[in-house]
């Protein structure tokens, strides 16, 4: 422990030091941070459902009926009626035969990958995959081969070099720091052609992409035959906490018996599970909310273009590149001074020299909010 102070000083000197900012209000388009009311442009609550009255009442009813905690792992005493209801809702919403809930999206990816991949498995993983996929690959006993981001030629070259007897292609559906989409139809074709299994993390696509918010499969017109393993989270557009995997019943049966993060973790609380189920139901019943989010994304990218910033706008995640860490820190502080909260993203979340402001659009943002954020962003960047 003698080097703790020195390590912290090194972090500060590299402009990588992080501190916690405290929100004293719910996640909405406006929040109070450290005592100041600002526009929120960095939340993953894409549909703004964290304040939805029906969803909150569902959580309260579950709390009153089932108590504050599950009291054990799902395989011992922690499997309650709300957990089974959630998995049924997930399977119906995602169009899969079955589903299995985890305590987080992180543990879902780690559990699924480490359970399915053995010593003879080759995993082909996109270079910009989320840390939970990277850590799941590290836990797995197979060989991990990283291919260049969304580069099908590089992926094919690596597959042809190795010719694995059993292999997985694993990718984010929406890449969390860049906001671009995986080339899923091409990945599905490659997986079929070479006898590989395609796994997609739909954390930032569920409730966001597709005509009804069912994710990347709906967006691209694919099925679970094309993508047999779909993971995701319950803490973004779905306004709760937890994670999931959707697939065949036999897949979920195997994971119930072999996925260590599922077996050795206390089950999610009944209130959180009930909130997730209610959130899924609300999204399914209100596709107009998903369209509103998609319309806001299109409007915001247009507003940014008017301010001289051209971004793809494939998803609600809008990265504005700053480059050096110090510049990103100054830009984020300048933006906050103008009433817009969008923290900078730095190493190790992104590579060194690729620091950025990561803005996210919500369905609850107004056009005035979006215009104000675009103008404020131009001013903040001009000052650094």
From Swiss-Prot:
Entry's Gene Ontology molecular function annotations: 8-amino-7-oxononanoate synthase activity; pyridoxal phosphate binding
Catalyzed reactions per annotation: 6-carboxyhexanoyl-[ACP] + L-alanine + H(+) = (8S)-8-amino-7-oxononanoate + holo-[ACP] + CO2
Keyword rRNA-binding tagged: no
Pathway(s) of this molecule: Cofactor biosynthesis; biotin biosynthesis
Modified residues (N6-(pyridoxal phosphate)lysine): 236
Keyword Cell membrane included in the entry's annotation: no
Cofactor dependence: pyridoxal 5'-phosphate
Superkingdom of origin organism: Bacteria
Enzyme nomenclature, EC number: 2.3.1.47
Binding positions for substrate per the UniProt entry: 18, 130, 349
Coiled coil: none
Binding site for pyridoxal 5'-phosphate: 105-106, 176, 201-204, 233-236
Entry keywords, A to Z: Biotin biosynthesis, Pyridoxal phosphate, Transferase
Gene3D superfamilies with a match to the protein in the record: Aspartate Aminotransferase, domain 1 (3.90.1150.10), Type I PLP-dependent aspartate aminotransferase-like (Major domain) (3.40.640.10)
Subunit organization: Homodimer.
Family membership noted in the UniProt record: Belongs to the class-II pyridoxal-phosphate-dependent aminotransferase family. BioF subfamily.
Function according to Swiss-Prot or TrEMBL: Catalyzes the decarboxylative condensation of pimeloyl-[acyl-carrier protein] and L-alanine to produce 8-amino-7-oxononanoate (AON), [acyl-carrier protein], and carbon dioxide.
Record's protein name: Putative 8-amino-7-oxononanoate synthase
Gene source species: Desulfovibrio desulfuricans (strain ATCC 27774 / DSM 6949 / MB)
